[in-house]
UniProtKB/Swiss-Prot annotation:
Bias (Polar residues): 1-11
Organism: Stenotrophomonas maltophilia (strain R551-3)
Chain intervals with Basic residues compositional bias: 12-24, 32-46
Region annotation (Disordered) ranges: 1-46
Membership in a protein family: Belongs to the bacterial ribosomal protein bL34 family.
Entry protein name: Large ribosomal subunit protein bL34
Keywords, in A-Z order: Ribonucleoprotein, Ribosomal protein
PROSITE patterns named among the record's database cross-references: RIBOSOMAL_L34 (PS00784)
Gene3D superfamilies the record matches: 1.10.287.3980
Amino acid sequence: MATKRTFQPSNLKRKRDHGFRARMKTADGRKILSRRRAKGRKVLSA
């Protein structure tokens, strides 16, 4: 039996799990965004 690939892309899940609004919902998510801003990331979230 062959094992399936683990990455099954879905834009909906991508945004829901890693999007800007998902990050803003939690305190830790906001920490992630502030770290990425401090680092100078062009893209903050998915």
